[in-house]
Amino acid sequence: MKTNKIVFIFGPTAVGKSDILFHFPKGVAEVISVDSIQVYKEFDIASCKPSIELRSHIRHHLVDFLEPIYEYNLGIFYKESCKIIESLREQKKIPIFVGGSAFYFKHLKYGLPSAPPVSDKVRLYINNLFIRMGKDYLLEELRRVDFKRYESINQNDIYRIKRSLEVYFQTGIPISQFLQRENMFENIVAIGLRRPMDEMKSRIISRVKNMIDCGLLDEIKSLLGKGYDEKTPAFKGIGYREFLLWRSRPCYLLNDIINLIVKNSFLYVKRQMTFFNKLPNVLWFHPDDDLKNILDLIFV
């Protein structure tokens, strides 16, 4: 088992990411949550935070630590993730990033922008070059203007190829001169979880019903009673924001709100899968049928 690896486990809402964690051996790995709502204290039920039982089985980071009034963003997530990775590597443990926030996974893989911003005009120019001339042409351009970057880049990684050329055409400086720090995220095992969409729809309906049964209405009343409202960042999450709509439109019935949560969740699942399907080098599994393969991939 390589202890310098970093594992990504991603998939859409309700696919069953947390369920497989109970099967992980104790003491050899820890989880870093990739979720923009689970970070908030008190917002427990609709965010589907990992249970106390699961957190006692395998330690979770970046869960239930931020006051609801504060914004959580990519910069905080990335900075904290880097610290956690360094700590876990010192302990010879595997960092396992688990969640469904596609935007965060993207920047875990490709890093935060460390070069100057690029104008829309330059970005459009490079993208049009790609559409008209193809990937090989862009690679040849990169070889010409930044041979160091050309030698080190994955030649199937069109995102980084385009980004490298954008920076050069914007600044006249090779991106290799901007990227001096060691990449912490080279040895990535990317595991994607997915189910058929009809199965996902059924699971979402069951999940929302369970939220109501577990006391979501009481949780929201308590949160509103403490002064949290539509300006509170944590209320942006699906399952919370719909109840703010209910408060402003008393004609809505509880069933209308439940149906709206189901609808918004399913639309979010579709957006998540659209993004995740674009990521290269992902090993896709059904979380129920392929559990042994997933465990072997991570721990053997």
From Swiss-Prot:
It catalyses: adenosine(37) in tRNA + dimethylallyl diphosphate = N(6)-dimethylallyladenosine(37) in tRNA + diphosphate. PANTHER family: TRNA DIMETHYLALLYLTRANSFERASE (PTHR11088:SF60). InterPro entries: Dimethylallyltransferase (IPR039657), IPT (IPR018022), P-loop_NTPase (IPR027417). The record marks S101, R123 as: Interaction with substrate tRNA. The lineage of its organism: Bacteria, Pseudomonadati, Spirochaetota, Spirochaetia, Spirochaetales. Its cofactor is Mg(2+). Residues 35-38 are annotated as: Interaction with substrate tRNA. Belongs to the IPP transferase family. The gene is miaA. Monomer. Substrate binds at T13, A14, V15, G16, K17, S18. The keyword Secreted does not apply. The keyword Transferase applies. It is an enzyme of class 2 (transferase). Its EC number is 2.5.1.75. Keywords: ATP-binding, Magnesium, Nucleotide-binding, Transferase, tRNA processing. GO terms for biological process: tRNA modification. This is tRNA dimethylallyltransferase. Catalyzes the transfer of a dimethylallyl group onto the adenine at position 37 in tRNAs that read codons beginning with uridine, leading to the formation of N6-(dimethylallyl)adenosine (i(6)A). One of its GO terms (molecular function) is tRNA dimethylallyltransferase activity. It holds the Pfam family IPPT.
